Amino acid sequence: MDFKYSDTVIHNGVVFYITDGGHRVYFLYGGCLLSVPRPHATAESGEIAKFGLTLRGLTHNDRVVANYVRSELNRTGRHESAPSSEEDVFVDRLEVLAQGAQAFGRDICGSFDLEVYDPYLAECMVSLKVTSGLIVSTGRDIPQDGMLHLYTVPTITNASSGFIYTPNIACFTLVQAYLTELPPELETLISGLFDHIPVARPPLRDESGGHSRTDIIVTSPRAVKTMAIGGTTRCSKRPLRKTVVSDFVQVRLIPKPCSIWDSASRVASGASLQSLQLLFKIADEIILIEEPWPGLDEHLNQARSTIVDAILAVYGNEGKLRFFGGKLTQQGVTTLQRFVLCQFILGKWNLINCYAALEQLAESYIGAVPEARDPLPDPHLVADAVNEIIRESGILGELCEIIVRYTQPTDPVNGSGSEVVELEARLLAEFAANATRVELGLSSYDEVRNMEARIASVLNKLYAKDGIGGAAQVACRILGSGLPVAIVLNVSSITAFDGLDLSRKGAYYLYYLLSERLKRGGVTVHVSRK
């Protein structure tokens, strides 16, 4: 859900978001969004509402996680904060648990991010054992658009490494709740707030008969569940038979997702080196520049935000997640440039990519800023950079398939210790087994773990900026064979511009890992069919 606001004000140390001409404010409370009207509002416009994710269970039919949070709140002495058995448990209760008995209303306000250090809750949310804690992000503020966005499914990252997990969607449900009154601590927090917020002057001819409704954009494909908290005249004791929308809400739009993903058939340049040179040069400018340039249409501007989400999913914040092309960073190649190189390779092989959207952004930017085109970077430098990525993914594919074919039940190889590498090693073992028609189900548990550990060792070398030489060196040691040296010679001859089978294999392994990272990062790859 998207919530439009016109301005912000800080009151009692908390940021409030002003909407509806000053008649209503939003504020963040433990990852949820509360909507509060101006005092003395009419019954129609005076509704207090709460929007946010609630905790459910391990499956769609149980409430294990919600019941656990209730019991923990009671066990730790926060009885007043524990919802009744009839009420859903909002994620703000997680912040109450994390901060303990000293937590006060203001301490829980102001952020979409929640910290979860309870090992049981962490495992329920991501289906993996986590010892370092989780950061659960329930939404984000987009100040340039004046918009607060609530996620249907949260983004969950490792509190230590920044690794992005795939959430257990059965654990969360987006809910709209009616509140008859605010808790006393929040009443105190907003006391005097509206004294500092002027009411927008209505037009001389106000045909609406009152102040305008608030625009809330519903983007979820599923209806938002509705519930009531406390007694209310508008809700009988009978359960609601359908989802209803708050009186102050006007659903204006259910938009299609911004479609940046496509096949190479729509790449205007045919994925040429010249187009790649231009994109390589201005990639950081067209994505990171804050203000839209003259002539940039709304769809392309929205595409920039979608591309940023994709880059964060693949490389993490500030590029902390290692990926192909790490060796290029030593030559000053940026994370955005590496992303462009990957999209070029995928476009060349008709795999789902966003290279056409990047080209359109570049064309629009050059139309507004012609001097940004020249001089183009050295074509040999750009070609070497994109070739490095296809060769790294190519040797990974070759070595993975050799490992799943010929791994023997020998002493296991030590893993890398990196969560992302170990997870991707498991995925690659299955992918390589399918490609070579090896039945992993016929192998023993120890054999499969040994395969995964060997793949992790190779992957770790590639991600650690050692390139194809480092990957071959570790492969020779763990396989006890010089075959990887011959593979290096073959891989060194492929390029991102040829049509060789080994190049195709590299593109497919690159696509598989990249698409899995997008999935874990919550980025939906919606393919245009226009």
Curated annotation (Swiss-Prot):
Chain segments annotated as transmembrane: none
Presence of the UniProt keyword Transit peptide in the record: no
Compartments it resides in: Virion tegument; Host cytoplasm; Host nucleus
Keywords linked to the UniProt accession: Host cytoplasm, Host nucleus, Virion, Virion tegument
Keyword Transferase appears in the UniProt entry: no
GO cellular component terms, semicolon-separated: host cell cytoplasm; host cell nucleus; viral tegument
InterPro entries: Herpes_UL21 (IPR004936)
The protein's assembly and partners: Interacts (via C-terminus) with UL16.
Function: May participate in DNA packaging/capsid maturation events. Promotes efficient incorporation of tegument proteins UL46, UL49, and US3 homologs into virions. May also play a role in capsid transport to the trans-Golgi network (TGN).
Family: Belongs to the alphaherpesvirinae UL21 protein family.
The name this protein goes by in its record: Tegument protein UL21 homolog
Organism: Equine herpesvirus 1 (strain V592)
